[in-house]
Amino acid sequence: MASGPNMEAPVCLVENENEELRVNSKAINILERITQPVVVVAIVGLYRTGKSYLMNRLAGQNHGFNLGTTVRSETKGIWMWCVPHPSKPKFTLVLLDTEGLGDVEKGDPKNDSWIFALAVLLSSTFVYNSMSTINHQALEQLHYVTELTERIRAKSTSRSEEVDDSDEFVSFFPDFIWTVRDFVLELKLEGRVITADEYLENALKLIPGMSIKAQKANLPRECIRHFFPRRKCFVFDRPTKDKELLVHVEEMPEDQLDHSFQVQSKEFCSYIFSNSKAKTLKEGIVVNGNRLATLVTTYVDAINSGDVPCLENAVTTLAQRENSIAVQKAADHYSEQMAQRMRLPTDTLQELLTVHTACEKEAIAVFMEHSFKDENQQFQKNLVVTIEEKKEDFLRQNEAASLSHCQAELDKLSESLRESISRGVFSVPGGHRLYLEARKKVEQDYERVPRKGVKANHVLQSFLQSQISIEDSIMQSDKALTDGQKAMEAERAQKEAAEKEQELLRQKQKELQQVMEAQERSYKENVAQLHEKMETERKNILREQEVKLEHKLKIQKDMLNEGFKRKCEAMDLEISQLQKEIQLNKEKNSSLGAKILDGFGDVLISVVPGSGKYFGLGLKILSSQMNQTQNSDKVRKL
């Protein structure tokens, strides 16, 4: 089990003491360490029907979940056992054993209903365990399924607006398996041999008639058929005919159990291992251990506060928590990759921006992988701002590294020049020419220094600015120059200074243009990955709707075949409405891009510092500065 302990024994997940449910923090801590998707198998049934034995077999053990040896129900609340999946190494198998339903020692029968509802909400495969046969009495005992509409909400509504949204259950309910223990009948129907699945489906056929008695008898049948489209049945012979041995069945060697029971148990386990899927919420949200922990806590908190557990609220809680973590993961990835791939100072700004673009693309992908239900792209916008701030910090670090490196190199290269000035080497006739030659050599040597970075021209320009007064002093004292020559030299110096300043401004303009282009790439990358994610989500919704439609059409067909024409016709409106929703969803594809551009695009421009109009304003200011410099140069020439 990746990122989690291999549990040697079960722990209580939801405690049920004095008719109050409480989440066990120890179990939550175990779940929070499981990063793999979880296949959750929950078993529910009347007390003392051998549920725990089946769960122990799934765990590959004889012992673990408490079987008990008396008529008292041993399992209280919901117990959990997390084990490595025996055939899917990338998944963790989470087994949930629930306390027996219908225990006479319980006071409030609602307690059983909540346990039943929690088992449905948490599992990807729901096993209902009963004894002997699936008859009228067995279906009556499964009345808990008829109460699910009062115990579970798919969508968030206020109490005054509560509506029956059980139509949505099919999109997130688990697969349903009915296990019949100590099966006493032959699998035959009207003289022909049938499968256990056919036996179940025959038992779920509606009883003809519209009497109150028939409607009451049909209610659990209809609920199972409507809520659980994927159904399976397993029947088991008695493990042993020896009543005394039966009490201690967990201690019996497997080869001493009835052969048929051994085969049936292996078939059951094999089916679970091969066919049980990872726990998935609506729209394809796959649940790992950490998410399961949040779901358990959210549902139990809702029950204890007097509310009905709501899937939409639970998903919102999950999204708020995980999307914040997704932003942090993505931002950390960006920082780590930038630090690994860059050597400061970079030779050019473009070198840094190229690395930034690659790292940002990866960071956005990390966010998309770990986020879901990001309403209005709130968290993606946070990531955009965070990455922009980190990029600005790297730009500052790059500038500081370049400044420090260039200043150190220039100080070293100009040391001889400074010493010559101090010693008065240039205070002789022809000294101005000697000074210019010495300074030119410093500039040429500086030019050959590798990887000076983005502040190379700035440092050189500052150095040359510091030499203006020194050059003028040397020139004025040079007796080899006439007044006319001095005037010409002064004009040349001014022209060179203006050209250097112009060159610096051109560099700034070029760098600003590069930053703008990087912002545009950032915008396009965010939109592209968002579009891809939204398209995937749209397809998931469409797939769920099509599964729901297929399920409704099957129910309608079965109703018609069973002679319930009125019920069949009543479904026409539901089916028609669902078909319209599917068509609308298909048409959304063409407008998806425009929606992203209109919504998220505008926000990106406003939340990213220095983008959009700010870049345009910066370009105008720089352009104005360049024009002013050029005009000043023209005035000097005149």
Swiss-Prot record:
Its EC number is 3.6.1.-, 3.6.5.-. Its main location: membrane. InterPro entries: G_GB1_RHD3_dom, GBP_C, Guanylate-bd/ATL_C, Guanylate-bd_C_sf, Guanylate-bd_N, P-loop_NTPase. Keywords: Antimicrobial, Antiviral defense, Cytoplasmic vesicle, GTP-binding, Hydrolase, Immunity, Innate immunity, Membrane, Nucleotide-binding. It comes from Mus musculus. Residues 590-638 are annotated as: C-terminal tail. Monomer and dimer. Interacts with CYBA, CYBA-CYBB complex and ATG4B. Interacts (via GB1/RHD3-type G domain) with NCF2 and NCF2-NCF4 complex. This is Guanylate-binding protein 7. Residues 1-310 are annotated as: GTPase domain (Globular). Interferon (IFN)-inducible GTPase that plays important roles in innate immunity against a diverse range of bacterial, viral and protozoan pathogens. Hydrolyzes GTP to GMP in two consecutive cleavage reactions and predominantly uses GTP and not GDP or GMP as the substrate. Following infection, recruited to the pathogen-containing vacuoles or vacuole-escaped bacteria and acts as a positive regulator of inflammasome assembly by promoting the release of inflammasome ligands from bacteria. Acts by promoting lysis of pathogen-containing vacuoles, releasing pathogens into the cytosol. Induction: By IFNG/IFN-gamma and IFNB1/IFN-beta. Up-regulated upon infection by T.gondii or L.monocytogenes. Up-regulated in response to influenza virus A infection.
